[in-house]
């Protein structure tokens, strides 16, 4: 986002925030193997940047002083080999959340947001789970605590695979839509339950018309598009592991 002469709204800044956030979540989840390799402790001070096009990059800090935008935490690569991987990723996630807020409110100040505009911006930001919550699985736990799972319902799905496997089956899973034969109150509860399901890659909520798949290792739900799994591919997967669990297993065997 550039300064420009056009009037900017909290919604404009929030779109920038959300795009940068999506990129950083990808780095710490679906692209974690690539991110881990790029954070070589032998290199100079490296930073994780979230970009406005929903991608990420690991790079050196800006050379200009002061920088055009607030800078993310320096030297995230130095702690990589001295910490447990999950703890290191959690630390990077915390610093990433801090940086995103700094950038958002930098734009807010630059565009002259008043009290109400700042409040609206923060409210939109606060409605999303933090990167830390997504990376550590806290967002998923909070969602479960907020809306208890309903039981005794048929689990039909509008996308393939045609049904959600039973707990002991090995196939990939998807959040089931509401049962049309249930009462209206139960339908609303089920719908709210689904809406509170968060993608482990992008952190967005479940949508009824979207294909989702569940990792059999960490039991985290993902948009199929976020982990590059289509309904056709899912039909042939007996035991699905998300990119994060797959890469962790590879490093454990190395």
Swiss-Prot record:
ZnF locations on chain (PHD-type): 196-248
Transmembrane portions of the chain: none
GO-annotated molecular function: histone binding; transcription cis-regulatory region binding; transcription coregulator activity; zinc ion binding
GO cellular component: nucleus
Keywords assigned by UniProt, alphabetized: Chromatin regulator, Metal-binding, Nucleus, Transcription, Transcription regulation, Zinc, Zinc-finger
Principal location listed in the UniProt entry: nucleus
One example of a Gene Ontology biological process annotation: chromatin organization
Positions marked as site (Histone H3K4me3 binding): 206, 212, 216, 221
Compositional bias annotation for Low complexity: 149-162
Biased amino acid composition, Acidic residues: 179-194
Protein location: Nucleus
InterPro entries the record matches: Alfin (IPR045104), Alfin_N (IPR021998), PHD_AL_plant (IPR044104), Zinc_finger_PHD-type_CS (IPR019786), Znf_FYVE_PHD (IPR011011), Znf_PHD (IPR001965), Znf_PHD-finger (IPR019787), Znf_RING/FYVE/PHD (IPR013083)
Residue segments, region Disordered: 137-194
A Pfam family matched in the record: Alfin
Keyword Hydrolase among record annotations: no
Free-text function comment from the UniProt entry: Histone-binding component that specifically recognizes H3 tails trimethylated on 'Lys-4' (H3K4me3), which mark transcription start sites of virtually all active genes.
Family membership noted in the UniProt record: Belongs to the Alfin family.
Subunit structure: Interacts with H3K4me3 and to a lesser extent with H3K4me2.
Name of this chain's protein: PHD finger protein ALFIN-LIKE 8
Lineage, highest ranks first: Eukaryota, Viridiplantae, Streptophyta, Embryophyta, Tracheophyta
């Amino acid at each position: 986002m550039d300064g420009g002469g056009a009037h900017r709204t909290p919604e404009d800044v929030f779109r920038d925030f959300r795009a940068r956030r999506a990129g950083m979540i990808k780095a710490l989840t679906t692209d974690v193997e690539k991110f881990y390799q790029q954070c070589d402790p032998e290199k100079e001070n490296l930073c994780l940047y979230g970009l406005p096009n929903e991608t990420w990059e690991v790079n050196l800090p800006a050379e200009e002083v002061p920088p055009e935008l607030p800078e993310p935490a320096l030297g995230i690569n130095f702690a990589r080999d001295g910490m447990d991987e999950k703890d290191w990723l959690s630390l990077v996630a915390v610093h990433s959340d801090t940086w995103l807020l700094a950038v958002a409110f930098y734009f807010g100040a630059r565009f002259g947001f008043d009290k109400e505009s700042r409040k609206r911006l923060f409210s939109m930001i606060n409605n999303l789970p933090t990167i830390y919550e997504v990376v550590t699985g806290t967002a998923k736990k909070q969602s479960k605590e907020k809306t208890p799972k309903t039981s005794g319902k048929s689990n039909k799905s509008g996308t393939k695979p045609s049904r959600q496997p039973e707990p002991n089956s090995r196939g990939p899973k998807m959040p089931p839509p509401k049962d049309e034969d249930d009462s209206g109150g139960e339908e609303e509860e089920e719908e709210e339950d689904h809406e509170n399901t968060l993608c482990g890659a992008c952190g967005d909520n479940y949508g009824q018309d979207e294909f989702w798949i569940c990792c059999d290792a960490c039991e985290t739900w993902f948009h199929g598009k976020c982990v590059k799994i289509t309904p056709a591919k899912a039909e042939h997967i007996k035991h699905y592991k998300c990119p994060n669990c797959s890469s962790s297993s590879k490093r454990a065997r190395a």
